[in-house]
C-alpha cells in the first residue's frame, strides 16, 4: 500500500468514525470535541505516509498473505536488469511519458477550486480594508472572560457579511455598523467572534479547504467540510454560553436569528455568525447544559483507539528463518 493510498483510506476511515460518534453521542459530548476530531481526519488526509501499528485491522488481512509476500522478495529484487545493454537503456529513456487522463481531471478540478476560493478571499479582503475601528467599551470584560492576552483587531463595516472573523496570523473581527456599542446584541455577537478567534477556527477552515481542494472527488471530504463548519458554529455557541452563563440563552438565540436574517452565505476561509443549520443551533442553545470534561476525554480516548485500529496500516514482523536478500554490488 502506497503512502497516498494509506492517507486516503486512513482519512476516510476517520471521517466515518467521526460521523458515527457524531450520530450516536453528539448530545452527550462537548461540542468543542467534534471540530478537533474533524481536524484529526483532515491532517491524516494530508499525510501521504503509511503508519504501521499492531492494532491495525489490516493485520488480519495481511497475515494470510505474509508467506506469499515473503516468497516474492527475491523475485522483486533479483535478477537485476542488464544495465550494460545500451539499447535497453536508450529504449527506456526515449519512451514517451504518459499522463493519466484521471490525473488531468484531478489537477483541473484542484486548480479551479483553489482559484475560486482564492479569488473570493482576495475580493473579500479588498472590500473590508475600508472598515472603521469599532468602539468596544465591553471589550476588556470579554477579553478577560475568554482569557485573551492580546486584543484582536475589531472593525465595523456596512457589509452584509458581517459579523465575521478572518485572518490566520492576525485575525480581524468585523462587526455590523448598526450595532450599538453598549447593547446586549453587540456583547453577544462580539463574544461569539472572540470564541472563533480563541479557537483558531480560521486556521481550521484553511485546513479543511486545502483538503477539499485536493480531495474534491471524495464525497466523504465534502461531508467532513460541511459538518465541520456546522460543528465549529455549535462549539462557539457552547463557548459563549459557558462563558456568559445559561441565563443569556434567550437573548443569544434572538441575536442569532437577527444576524442570520441579514447575513448571506459565509465567505470562504472565514468564521462568521452565520445561520447555517439555524434550527439545529437554536435547539442546541435551548437544551444547553454543561457537559462533564471527562465525557469528552473518554470519547477522545475511544476515538484514538478506533483510529489506530481503522486508519493505520499493518505492521508485519520479518519472516522467521529467512535471510534478507542483499543485492550484490555491480
Residue ranges of predicted features:
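Cytosolic-side transmembrane helix boundary signature
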Residues: 14-28, 268-298
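Hydrophobic, aromatic-rich membrane-embedded alpha-helical segments
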Residues: 45, 50, 167, 173, ...
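Active-site recognition of the HExxH zinc-binding catalytic motif
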Residues: 187-204, 208, 236-237
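Active-site scaffold of zinc-dependent metalloenzymes
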Residues: 161-183
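Internal/C-terminal transmembrane anchor helices
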Residues: 44-47, 289-317
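Auxiliary, metal-adjacent structural segments of Zn-dependent hydrolase domains
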Residues: 119-164
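Hydrophobic membrane-embedded segments
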Residues: 1-118, 129-132, 144-151, 278, ...
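Short helix/loop segments within enzyme catalytic domains
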Residues: 135-136, 142-149, 198-199, 223-279, ...
Amino acid at each position: 500500500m502506497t503512502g497516498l493510498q494509506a492517507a486516503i483510506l486512513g482519512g476516510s476511515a476517520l471521517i466515518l468514525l467521526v460521523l458515527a460518534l457524531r450520530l450516536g453521542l453528539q448530545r452527550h459530548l462537548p461540542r468543542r470535541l467534534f471540530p478537533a476530531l474533524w481536524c484529526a481526519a483532515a491532517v491524516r488526509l494530508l499525510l501521504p505516509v503509511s503508519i504501521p501499528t499492531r492494532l491495525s485491522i489490516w493485520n488480519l488481512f495481511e497475515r494470510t498473505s505474509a508467506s506469499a509476500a515473503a516468497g516474492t522478495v527475491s523475485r522483486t529484487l533479483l535478477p537485476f536488469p542488464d544495465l550494460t545493454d545500451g539499447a535497453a537503456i536508450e529504449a527506456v529513456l526515449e519512451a514517451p511519458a504518459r499522463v493519466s487522463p484521471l490525473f488531468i481531471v484531478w489537477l483541473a478540478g484542484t486548480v479551479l477550486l483553489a482559484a475560486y476560493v482564492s479569488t473570493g478571499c482576495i475580493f473579500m479582503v479588498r472590500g473590508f480594508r475600508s472598515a472603521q475601528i469599532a468602539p468596544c467599551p465591553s471589550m476588556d470584560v470579554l477579553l478577560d472572560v475568554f482569557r485573551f492576552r492580546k486584543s484582536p483587531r475589531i472593525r465595523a463595516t456596512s457589509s452584509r457579511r458581517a459579523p465575521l472573523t478572518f485572518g490566520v496570523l492576525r485575525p480581524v473581527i468585523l462587526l455590523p455598523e448598526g450595532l450599538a456599542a453598549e447593547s446586549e446584541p453587540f456583547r453577544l455577537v462580539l463574544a461569539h467572534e472572540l470564541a472563533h478567534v480563541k479557537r483558531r477556527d480560521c486556521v481550521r477552515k484553511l485546513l479543511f479547504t486545502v483538503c477539499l481542494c485536493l480531495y474534491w472527488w471524495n464525497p466523504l471530504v465534502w461531508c467532513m467540510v460541511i459538518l465541520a463548519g456546522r460543528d465549529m458554529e455549535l462549539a462557539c455557541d457552547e463557548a459563549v454560553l459557558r462563558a456568559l452563563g445559561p441565563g443569556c440563552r434567550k437573548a443569544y438565540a434572538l441575536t442569532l436569528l437577527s444576524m442570520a436574517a441579514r447575513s448571506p452565505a459565509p465567505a470562504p476561509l472565514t468564521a462568521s455568525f452565520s445561520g447555517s443549520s439555524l434550527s439545529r443551533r437554536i435547539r442546541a442553545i435551548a437544551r444547553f447544559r454543561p457537559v462533564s470534561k471527562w465525557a469528552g476525554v473518554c470519547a477522545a480516548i475511544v476515538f484514538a483507539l478506533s483510529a489506530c485500529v481503522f486508519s493505520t496500516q499493518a505492521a508485519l514482523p520479518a519472516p522467521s528463518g529467512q535471510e534478507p536478500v542483499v543485492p550484490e554490488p555491480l
